[in-house]
Amino acid sequence: MKLLKKSSSLKKGVTKRAKLQKKPPSKDEASSSDEELAKLDGEGSLDGNESEEDDGTVQVEKGGMKKHKLDLEALKKSDPEFFKFLQQEDADLLNMEEDEDDDEEGEDNEDEEDEEEEEESDEDDDEEDDDKTKIKKIRKPKVKSDSSGRLIVDSNVYSYLQQVLVLDDETTTPINPSDVRMAIDVFVACVARVGADIEAPKYVINEQSIFEAVVRMCFQAMPDVLKRLLKARPDGEKVLFSKTMIKKYQTYVRTYLHAMIVFLNEVQTTEVIIATLKAITRLVDLYAHFSRMSKLLIKAIVKIWSRKTLECRLPAFVCMNLLVKNYPQHFVPLYKTAYVAFVANSKVVTNETWPLLQFMHRTFAEITMINPEQAYKYAFVYIRQTAVHLRNAMIAKGRKDLIFSIYNWQMMQCMYMWVRVIAKAHSVNGAEQIGELVYPLIQVIVGIFKLCNAPTFLPLRLHCCQMLIQLQASCTNYIPIMQLSCDCLEELARELKSKPKPAKGAVKLPDIECTLKCSTQYSDLPQWRKTISEHVFRTMMQSAHLLASQAAFPDVALPINHRIATILDTMKNADQAHLFRGFQTKLKEHSRFVLDVLARKHVDLNDEMQVRAVRFDLNNPDSPIKSFYRQWEKVWKMKEKSALENSKKDDKKKKKEEEAAKKRKATETLEDDDDEDAKPTIPKAKRKRIKIGAAAKRADATVPDQFADMSLANWSDED
């Protein structure tokens, strides 16, 4: 009964406490309510060891748990029915032990969870610290300014830019646009230091080491930085950029791209030009997005491709090829600019410039094959333009200016280049249209050959024969080169009729490959006649070697033999006559060889297999013409090697002489300076004044003034 009273009092206390909590107490009632709550807590405790929380749950302290258990056991023994009633109605009074155990376990679990959360929070703090160290903002250095107000780039600025821009992890590291802008402004200062005519930049660089370090850093880091800033993504060989980012940062990008082009135009050192071109090649995808920048880039790289050394021209061609290959819209302006630049820079041909011109021939042919459909339109127009010049010169033969508009290196180099382009087109699929231009090109070259028959232009006619040989070898078209070479032989025979005039002393002859016209001072020399006859013989051998495997060789060689025989009858020089007679005998032997092969086999022209079998038999390496050609080819190679060695020796001698002359001048200037310094200063002696008499003062009117021509009116620097 006592327990029932206690439980009922507990319930009454809980309800009363809830009511007191719902009503907000006033200031007067606050102290009384606290006392009542304290009394309620005291009334509901079991022997001072039990308390009740705000939610009505009972908490029993550990000290009164044993006594509570003993009371429950005594109640169970004394009144089992009431104990069952308590189990059904108020089981919380009986389950105090289990609740306490659960509370203890819960406290233990909460302690463990708190420990785990503390450990995890510590780990998270460590990770955050690591991230902060990774994405740690670097303080911008304080930049000093000079007297004009421009900011000075020193080692602190360079180290800051290097830490910000040169980053290993590209994905996680963000890029600050202000840092990119600062780097671009610093590079513009480098461009101004080179000597470019631009506005005064924001920054200025005074140290050469800082200048070189900044340029190197921009070349290495800026392409990747701009790609990350513009959110670039690869698309095959091209790189695509975000349109929104390009619109947002186009002023930055255009400034840097223009600065790179200005820097490329200003520098002159080969190593710096190559490094700049490599950096620009990494930015080609970015240049292609801006039409004005792409035009400036085309002008700059074509200028290097046509004017600089071979080491510089190669990376320029790589940049040109990449721009045209990935972005066809820039093909036409680049193609036009390259052709005009080639024509403008082919006026002078020497042994040093020939490799550069040949490089331009090959690279222009490669660019043509990238887009042959568009290139055909302009190739047709350019070849037609040369034909128009030739027609004007043929109509007015008496005008030397029109003849020399054809007989110059620009026209001949254009012919060489189109020969290379058409020869390349016959080996590339899809370039059939350009391959068809071989017919008008042959007509133009033959017209140039027949324009003027003067013996002084014999080297030019040999150049025309060499171009026709290249076309016939690559295009498999028959060209009457042997007849044209016989025309050269006739001119040579006319020149050999006159007696040679030996030179006085050692004379250096011009290289036939680098000359179009032979002057009269060389034409009468025996050394020149020997070299020109060897070149004529070589062209005749090459033209015969091209036809050696053709069944029509006897028919072509028959009139050639008669012409050579008549020409040799008039030739007085025994050495040259012996050279061409050997060629004539080989023509006869090879024509017999071809007739014997054709006589042994029955050939049906409609059967391709039989025709191929005959060509295979005629293409015998032991045939008379081919074996004879191999022997002479070895001789020609040996002569070319010796000529190259001699030219190298001459160049070395010239360099040594120039260096010695410079040293002499330097020593002479030093000696003159020393002599001037060593001259003693002699004090001038005071002159005694001589008294002039009255008779001496009177001037003689009969004596003329000897210094009249040195008056102020007639005196000038030119005199």
UniProtKB/Swiss-Prot annotation:
Main localization, broad class: nucleus
Sequence ranges of Acidic residues compositional bias: 89-130
Location relative to the cell: Nucleus
Superkingdom per UniProt: Eukaryota
Comp. bias intervals (Basic residues): 1-24
Alphabetical GO biological process terms: cell differentiation; gonadal mesoderm development; negative regulation of transcription by RNA polymerase II; ribosomal large subunit biogenesis
Keywords: Developmental protein, Differentiation, Gonadal differentiation, Nucleus
Gene Ontology MF, one: histone binding
Composition-biased stretches (Basic and acidic residues): 25-42, 643-661
Region (Disordered): 1-67, 86-136, 643-719
One annotated Gene Ontology cellular component of this protein: nucleolus
Annotated InterPro entries: ARM-type_fold (IPR016024), Noc2 (IPR005343)
Task of the protein: Required for normal somatic gonad development and for regulation of germline development and proliferation.
Family label: Belongs to the NOC2 family.
Official protein name in the record: Nucleolar complex protein 2 homolog
Organism: Caenorhabditis briggsae
Upper lineage: Eukaryota, Metazoa, Ecdysozoa, Nematoda, Chromadorea
